Amino acid sequence: MDLILLEEKDAADWVYRGEGAANIVLAYAGSAPHLIQVLVSREFLEEIERNIKSHRPDWRIDAAKVDTLNESALLISDHSLFPHGIFKGNACISVEIKPKCGFLPFSKHIARQNAIKRSTTRFKMHQVLKFRQQKIPNLSEYDPLDLFSGSKERIHEALKALCNNPQNNFRVFLNGSLILGGFGGVADNSTTTAEALEDVFKYVIEADDGLRMTSFLELLTETVYKSGVLDRLLDVQKLDNYDVEGAIHAYYNFISQPCSVCRQLGEDKVSPISTFLHALPPNESLEIVKKFLIAATAKDCSLMFCFRRREDGGSDSPYDRVYLESTNQVFDYKVHFIDLDLKPLEKMEYYYELDQKIVSAYTEALQNGPGTENNHTVKLYESIQ
């Protein structure tokens, strides 16, 4: 197909949707035909940066600027909507979930002092570090093990916890517009409250006032349970069978550099199992690291669930259906994985250092216990017991 160059005048057709560590996501609000690949001018990107600045979280602006030297932009489907917009006038509600790691690590490479990792989820421990860094105002009660459990009751509890404290793990859209959750940062505040969704959901869920939120969670629970999509995600996450504490040695072995982890421990304290990893052929070391990075992507990706009411008697829809018993409604739904960028090899050291910080913060919070003069520590201790 022909490439289209976007100029400064075209920037007004693009609106801020969110961002991650490496990419900013914009929604196209213009009327041009379907676009797949576009060239962009420096002036277009400069104008985009000005247009979206007021919508970006402050900490994102400080962390990264738009690269105005890029010559092209990646266009992807907006999975918060069904294709061709709103079908037959029905409202579309979408839910983005970042489920995080759904299992407890079982690797024999986990150090004795970090054994807490085998009994406490990474998400729960990371909450403590984020709280200490003042990136979140309170600790989430969400447990990824509940969401991945295969139990409808536990899935419901997990989704309720996410809805009550979305952070950057839960977002709700109505017709493509964000109505619950932040714009993509751990410090974001929700744009609304769960209670305020009651009024919004009247366009989608035929329940009495005060019951729409309950019905919404029932719909989402049924869909997560029925789709089985988390089982597939968990299989990929479990490609990490060495944990970062093992994979880091394979990484240094592959790049043929002295291992900083072993150097910090001292030669007399390096375990035989770590020595074994440093003796592997490069291709085997690379395989360990590749699987770790693929699993890391699966642990950090998001799922987008999109719903619209199916018309009475409608049977020609190409989408799967889910029945909401409490309102006797049938919904079309579709599920997509998003944020599947493969993690770069160069981030291995960062992953190891972050892992150690997370475990250290959680262990210290447990050890300090109640009675300390630090109010934050007291609050942490009470929350994690």
Model-derived regions, located:
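Polybasic, positively charged surfaces/segments
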Residues: D2-Q385
